[in-house]
Curated annotation (Swiss-Prot):
Species of origin: Escherichia coli O7:K1 (strain IAI39 / ExPEC)
GO MF terms held by the record: DNA binding; DNA ligase (NAD+) activity; metal ion binding
Reactions the enzyme catalyzes: NAD(+) + (deoxyribonucleotide)n-3'-hydroxyl + 5'-phospho-(deoxyribonucleotide)m = (deoxyribonucleotide)n+m + AMP + beta-nicotinamide D-nucleotide
Amino-acid positions noted as binding NAD(+) in the UniProt annotation, renumbered to this chain: 32-36, 81-82, 113, 136, 173, 290, 314
GO cellular component, one term: cytosol
EC top class, as a word: ligase
Protein's job: DNA ligase that catalyzes the formation of phosphodiester linkages between 5'-phosphoryl and 3'-hydroxyl groups in double-stranded DNA using NAD as a coenzyme and as the energy source for the reaction. It is essential for DNA replication and repair of damaged DNA.
Any single GO BP term: DNA repair
Key words, A-Z: DNA damage, DNA repair, DNA replication, Ligase, Magnesium, Manganese, Metal-binding, NAD, Zinc
Protein name: DNA ligase
Positions of the catalytic residues: 115 (n6-amp-lysine intermediate)
Gene: ligA
Domain BRCT intervals: 593-671
Length: 671
């Protein structure tokens, strides 16, 4: 059995290794939850044996050493981290400790914020001008990232307003919105560059580039949450008051900061943020709870590495470790072959996960994944679980290579990978049962033809029994034929037939989206429908004409043109129309006759809207004569940016396109 000294040494060595990977290399190997568990284990042992605590123990400092490639900045006021709690019981215990330490009847008000998952930085302003910026580093010394921080548009180079202190050091988090993260990885996959595991790594990698020109191309943003140095000036005596003052001086502050008058209100805030988490547009891993009164903060003081007056209340872990038992290959509706990892089941963010996507062959190669490997699994919001990285330091000896198929695992047709594309595809087309199933599932989905009650299991049976080969065959189904399916009684069968009859009345945009043309999503389908007005006009359009539609470039135009050039596709469309599928004749909207600031403009929505849904906003804009596109290009006239807008906003600013916020959009919609 190991001695206590050996256990402590092993834990410290392991934690230092993972701190180095996380803070210095921006390449964490284990989930945060596993790091937290190891740290708790070390802290508990040291609490029982305080005589064995060493000055260099991970419990006695904040982070890891800075990279030698950057010059260093010593923090005049140390940048401490926060202690964590992981459940309501632990938070209530923290709340009681605070009340007991204050030893007074004075009321405690809590200031609650989002715990952003990015990179902590300090920014020093002298006479209102940004003079330096640094990472947290080890809490005492950080890396000089001034040149890179100056490229972040959210951070003012000069504060504005009155009574700005002579020296003011603000602290906050640089992070990357999810839309920007996806765009960076999409570009990297296309060009063979580095693909990041998550937005936090991407933000850290972007901020710590030696070439600021690379940082400038990344859509980083920033929220401030505190102060370090303060000289030659005053700030309000509450935490919220300081944040509001920062905002007046032009510094970005999250609009989700909330005052809570009791522990019950704090818990309600925590659960509301947890509920809203998937729609925020950026990653958070909990909430931060601070005493609002600066006087009470000073009274409570600090422990070795954290303040006594604040705590991070973390959400259930979104990353866990498990083993890959096998890799199987699925076939999508366009023939895309997607590798899927079959996992030893593990609970991630409250959900039992047994499968995770591996995207494509390049991703398997990037990960260096082998069957039998120990891996980190991530699940964020409604996103399909994915493998973040392989824990190479714990690779078993009996792992096996993942072999990508050369023939379709469903129909046996050749698998083809077009040069320049990451995705390999089955060449079988509709002779492939898997493609047929997925195409039909897409056709009946809610945002396409919206056939109520026609679920995946019904489609699977219809294809397997050879009842349905094309979408048009769906409308030939009878209640009698459907009754023969598993768990389908006469009443349910008649309901499906009625739903199919109802679905025949649709819109041109929904019909186009339902056809499943490659690269044609809802926004593009709506744009094509609005531009051409009729199916006949769209079918006859050339590639050049198609590119005149907002959000349609050469790739999408080619896919659309090729789809309608294929005789089998035209035959299916003819059959659908013959079965009674129809939509209203186009209403020609003359932008010149509409009295609206949006009339005739190509508009792009980005970020999260708080006052109305994105669908409602799109519908309202179209009513007022706008064309709503899905991406920013030189054809774009206006970008409406909600909270945490990402790469689309950055591109709009780069192209000099007019940008307004949600409040201005609502004002114009009402004008």
């Amino acid at each position: 059995m190991e001695s206590i000294e050996q256990q402590l040494t092993e834990l410290r060595t392991t934690l230092r290794h993972h701190e180095y990977l996380y803070h210095v290399m921006d390449a964490p190997e284990i989930p945060d939850a596993e790091y937290d568990r190891l740290m708790r284990e070390l802290r508990e042992l040291e609490t029982k044996h305080p005589e064995l605590i060493t000055p260099d123990s991970p419990t006695q400092r904040v982070g890891a050493a800075p990279l030698a490639a950057f010059s260093q900045i010593r923090h005049e006021v140390p940048m401490l981290s926060l202690d964590n709690v992981f459940d309501e019981e632990s938070f209530l215990a923290f709340n009681k400790r605070v009340q007991d330490r204050l030893k007074s009847n004075e009321k405690v008000t809590w200031c609650c914020e989002l715990k952003l998952d990015g990179l902590a930085v300090s920014i020093l302003y002298e006479n209102g001008v940004l003079v330096s910026a640094a990472t947290r580093g080890d809490g005492t010394t950080g890396e000089d990232i001034t040149s890179n921080v100056r490229t972040i548009r959210a951070i003012p180079l000069k504060l504005h307003g009155e009574n700005i202190p002579a020296r003011l050091e603000v602290r906050g988090e640089v992070f990357l919105p999810q839309a920007g993260f996806e765009k960076i990885n999409e570009d990297a996959r296309r060009t063979g560059g580095k693909v990041f595991a998550n937005p936090r790594n991407a933000a850290a990698g972007s901020l710590r580039q030696l070439d600021p020109r690379i940082t400038a191309k990344r859509p980083l943003t920033f929220f401030c949450y505190g102060v370090g140095v303060l000289e030659g000036g005053e700030l309000p005596d509450t935490h919220l008051g300081r944040l509001l003052q920062f905002k007046k001086w032009g510094l970005p502050v999250s609009d989700r900061v909330t005052l809570c008058e009791s522990a019950e209100e704090v818990l309600a805030f925590y659960h509301k943020v947890e509920e809203d988490r998937p729609t925020l547009g950026f990653d958070i891993d909990g909430v931060v709870i601070k005493i609002n009164s600066l006087a009470q903060q000073e009274q409570l003081g600090f422990v070795a590495r954290a303040p006594r007056w604040a705590v991070a209340f973390k959400f259930p872990a979104q990353e866990q470790m498990t083993f890959v038992r096998d890799v199987e290959f699925q076939v999508g509706r366009t023939g895309a072959i997607t590798p899927v990892a079959r996992l030893e089941p593990v609970h991630v963010a409250g959900v039992l996960v047994s499968n995770a996507t591996l995207h494509n062959a390049d991703e398997i190669e990037r990960l260096g994944l082998r069957i039998g490997d120990k891996v980190v699994i991530r699940r964020a919001g409604d996103v399909i679980p994915q493998v973040v990285n392989v824990v190479l330091s714990e690779r078993p000896e009996d792992t096996r290579e993942v072999v990508f198929p050369t023939h379709c695992p469903v129909c046996g047709s050749d698998v083809e990978r077009v040069e320049g594309e990451a995705v390999a595809r089955c060449t079988g087309g509709l002779i492939c049962g898997a493609q047929r199933k997925e195409s039909l599932k897409h056709f009946v989905s809610r945002r396409a033809m919206d056939v109520d009650g026609m679920g995946d299991k019904i489609i699977d049976q219809l294809v397997e029994k050879e009842y349905v080969h094309t979408p048009a065959d769906l409308f030939k189904l009878t209640a009698g034929k459907l009754t023969g399916l598993e768990r389908m009684g006469p009443k349910s069968a008649q309901n499906v037939v009625n739903a199919l009859e109802k679905a025949k009345e649709t819109t041109f945009a929904r019909f186009l989206y339902a056809l499943g043309i490659r690269e044609v999503g809802e926004a593009t389908a709506a744009g094509l429908a609005a531009y051409f007005g009729t199916l006949e006009a769209l079918e006859a359009a050339s590639i050049e004409e198609l590119q005149k539609v907002p959000d349609v470039g050469i790739v999408v135009a080619s896919h659309v043109h090729n789809f309608f050039a294929e005789e089998s596709n035209r035959n299916v469309i003819s059959e659908l129309l013959a079965e009674g599928v129809h939509w209203p004749a186009p209403v020609v909207i003359n932008a010149e006759e509409i009295d609206s600031p949006f009339a005739g403009k190509t508009v792009v929505l980005t970020g999260s809207l708080s006052q109305m849904s994105r669908d409602d906003a799109k519908a309202r804009l179209v009513e007022l004569g706008a064309k709503v596109a899905g991406s920013v290009s030189k054809k774009t006239d206006l970008v409406i940016a909600g909270e945490a807008a990402g790469s689309k906003l950055a591109k709009a600013q780069e192209l000099g396109i007019e940008v307004i916020d949600e409040a201005e959009m609502l004002r114009l919609l009402g004008s």
